[in-house]
Structures are given as C-alpha cells and as structure tokens.
Amino acid sequence: MRLGVLDVGSNTVHLLVVDAHRGGHPTPMSSTKATLRLAEATDSSGKITKRGADKLISTIDEFAKIAISSGCAELMAFATSAVRDAENSEDVLSRVRKETGVELQALRGEDESRLTFLAVRRWYGWSAGRILNLDIGGGSLEVSSGVDEEPEIALSLPLGAGRLTREWLPDDPPGRRRVAMLRDWLDAELAEPSVTVLEAGSPDLAVATSKTFRSLARLTGAAPSMAGPRVKRTLTANGLRQLIAFISRMTAVDRAELEGVSADRAPQIVAGALVAEASMRALSIEAVEICPWALREGLILRKLDSEADGTALIESSSVHTSVRAVGGQPADRNAANRSRGSKP
C-alpha cells in the first residue's frame, strides 16, 4: 500500500510518501518539504493570521496533488502544536477541509507522544527493555516511557524550541543572562514532570527523536544523514554542554553555516539545545541514542495495525483521507518529481 503522510509542524509542512504493509518495514519513496513558520504566523490574540492560513491551504493543496500523482491510496494529514494551540484552530481546520478536501487533524499532545513512542519501540524492539524517549518540536517537548508499545507515561509540555526562542531568546546572538535565565526556568519547569517519568521506572535505553536532536547529534560528531538510518548516533550530555557554549555566541546566520543545521532551524537551535540539556539533566540521562523513526512513522504503523484489527487509528478521531476524494486533478508527475526533496 502506498501512503502519504502530511505533517504540518510549527516550522515546516512535510509530505512523506511510503510503501508500507503490516509486518513490513515502511519504505520511504519521496519527501517534500515547505518552510511556512506557521508558529510565527499568529497575531497578538493567538490566532493564525489569514495570510498564514492562506499559505497553509495553498501548500496542502499542492502536496495533496503530489500525493495523487505519486500513487498514494490514502493521505494521512495531521498538525501539531502550531495549529493545535491556535485560538482559531477549528476555523483553520475547517477552511483546509472545505478548500482542499483534506481532513487535517490537530493531534493531541498526548497522542503525538504515544505515536512517536510506538515508532521508537518498533525500531528498537522488545529487547531494548524500558525505553524513555524525548522529542523536541517547534512548540512542544514530548516525553514518553514504557516497556510495551503503549507507553505508561506520555507527556506533552509547552517547551518547544521555536516557542522558547520567541519568548526567551529574542536577541541574535542571545545574551548570556537570558541563556542563564532560560536554563534556570527549564530546570524548574521540568522538576515535576521528571519525577512522574522516573517513578514509572529507570530506562534501559534513553532515546531521542526529532530534527532538533538529529542536528545536535550531528554538531557533536554523529554521522551525517547520508550515512544511512541504521548507523548508530548518540548525543552525550557533556558534548551538549560544550556545544551550547559554542553556538550560543554565534548569530543565526553563522549557525546556519554549520553542518547539520538548516537555515530555518538555525534561529532556534540554541533554545532546542537548552531544552535537550535540561531534559537530560532532569532525567539523569548521560547520553541518548538518536532514533530515525518518529511521529510520521508511528502514524503509519498505527494505521497498518488499525486496518488489521479494526481499531480506531487514534482514540475518538481519524487523520486519514482518501486521496481520490481530494479536490483537483492529479498534478503533473514531472512537476511533482521536480518539487520533491531528497529521500529521508
């Protein structure tokens, strides 16, 4: 089965096309991205602006046509914190549905955490024992822990890299005092959640997912993406501390020149590093292993499982749409190929 997964994040919209079947390894066929910075397209009342919504709708419409031309049987479309937290999220979702035919759903933070954990568990298998997973997005930090495929603990905290950059580190480069203040604030914010997580049990394996963690690992010496997903990559607490001291003195333009840091992520990588550092400190983790699978893969796996046993894809909700029901004619296949990024 060929599936399309449309991920509307705080910074980017990402379409992943995969060939997948139950019991098999989902095979990525193409990846298409657009940088919208949706989290920044909000007004003083917390609403996504008309311009931001218009850009989102245009991008989703384009990507839905790419999914059709790629031969996808279904398109699973979901949004994370930028849409979820917006005051007018329902209005935006309604516009997307009416103008594109795509049923975009704002995932609950807990579902985001659970689906990511499912992907991590499937990647490492049962022999990994208790897994603790950290995932830093633009708007939130997800923390999950468990010994099964369903985590015992699944938290979503408003500690995303983009959110904290806007709220705490407006200067470029950020001032030392602001960095120190954010460190102290993060320690306080993570004190109670970390107790909840550790009470469930100490992890046998600490894992991290998300582009933020992959970039941080690369900056501290992990293998580049071209080495493939099965190469072991780790991020240590000591390496992270040294990295923060280095990148916090750089401008966003200079950080964007570093290998592993894209131009759209460069402004928020310092805040992301501080969240990673504080999370590892609060949970007494000295190193995390970087998992190449995350939320998108978790959604694909849950989709395949739900078709086999007849359960709901996500409790009380659905995030899939028949691509054939999407309005508009299939896009020109060559145009779709030209707009695709490199394979993950």
From Swiss-Prot:
Catalytic activity as recorded in UniProt: [phosphate](n) + H2O = [phosphate](n-1) + phosphate + H(+)
One annotated GO molecular function: pyrophosphatase activity
Keyword Iron-sulfur: no
Keyword presence, Methyltransferase: no
Cofactor: Mn(2+)
Region (Disordered): 319-344
Entry keyword set: Hydrolase, Manganese
EC number from the UniProt entry: 3.6.1.11
Protein purpose: Degradation of inorganic polyphosphates (polyP). Releases orthophosphate processively from the ends of the polyP chain. Prefers short-chain length polyphosphates as substrates. Can also hydrolyze ATP and ADP substrates, but lacks GTPase activity. Cannot hydrolyze pppGpp to ppGpp.
Subunit structure of this chain's protein: Homodimer.
Protein name: Exopolyphosphatase 1
The species this protein was found in: Mycobacterium tuberculosis (strain ATCC 25618 / H37Rv)
Gene encoding the protein: ppx1
